[in-house]
């Protein structure tokens, strides 16, 4: 095991979760800096029309990124189980299968992106002035998604080994490339919104090459020669199916959550450019506020998978309990900071009109408040379920969160009951409550049925 790696099957759990989660928080922040920098640069150079374009396109980007991360995370979970079992050959097979799934997934996303971008944005009521920018951004991102797919596949392998520092270094380089290209392509090169997409694609492709090289050099399980030799007793298809068994529910889970945000954005678009721009900025800020939660969740998934692979079920249970407490505590601090700094954060995104600023601040007042505690709990329990081998629960919870509450309640409150866009904000805040309770019941059932 590399010096940068951590084993969650031994040692103090909280310290190991913290040591693993901190670099992942930085990784997640840097990854979303791509979208944040895109929005800030486009907002300053192109103006409100460009900001609406990229706000809508960013929702599409989140769906693509969510699918990429979710699908490759399935491979990471399978690898982590083999890490816990100390099975290098199994790690090699799982990694090879993950790369194969990633390449197939990138091809599918490219085809779907080109075919569906324009009709999807048209159906979602993107203002005419912003339509071309949103379509162009999305098409470039989808056609160039092989880089992000391969980067996340390699990063999932590294994280399964307990190595969170190497992904941080790679994403750091990628972020610097992205910022530099944004400053050149959006303004001086005259590409506008599409230039921001090209900057992201090139930057992530650079990180992909670096990640693949690092995995091969540092880890025996990352050397693919002989992964599926003819004399082996595990066929290629079986390894691919195992990755897909975890990866598809995980990918669908993350994708449907982001799809629901795109649908909610469609509801908000009907209230005009000011509300749409304000909500886009508010969503970006609340997304960044959720990054620590996601990092801790990734730590929980890896730790749970390693311990499940090693047969340490009692320790896996402790991962869920300690991780959830850790996550909720961190999010309390984040939500307080957002509430105190909301006006300044909104101004940093280039919003200057009083109505737009007030709407964005209201978005944060409602969606970054007490509901964050339920969100942190929901994400922690779902992350444990994924690592422990129950991906279908994660998918079911995401459908409740995304469609039953976030979109369904938003449609009811804003339209049927006449609360307007404020009703949409309230629905977004309420969405994690029910899934958090279901996750808590699952953990209780899991511990009782395994007598731990």
Give the location of each predicted region:
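Helix-terminus/linker motif at the lipid-water interface of multi-pass membrane proteins
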Residues: 29, 33-52, 121-128, 184-191, ...
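Small-residue-rich hydrophobic transmembrane alpha-helices
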Residues: 51-111, 148-167, 278-342, 375-397
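Transmembrane alpha-helix boundary and packing residues in multipass membrane permease domains
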Residues: 24, 28, 40, 77, ...
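Short alpha-helical transmembrane segments in multi-pass integral membrane proteins
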Residues: 1-21, 79-146, 177-180, 188-248, ...
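Small-residue hotspots at the loop-to-helix junctions and early N-terminal turns
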Residues: 46-59, 134-138, 197, 273-288, ...
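Transmembrane helical elements of multi-pass membrane transporters/channels
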Residues: 19-38, 140, 144, 151, ...
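N-terminal transmembrane alpha-helices
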Residues: 8-45, 59-74, 78, 103-110, ...
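Transmembrane alpha-helical segments of integral membrane proteins
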Residues: 378-379, 405-414
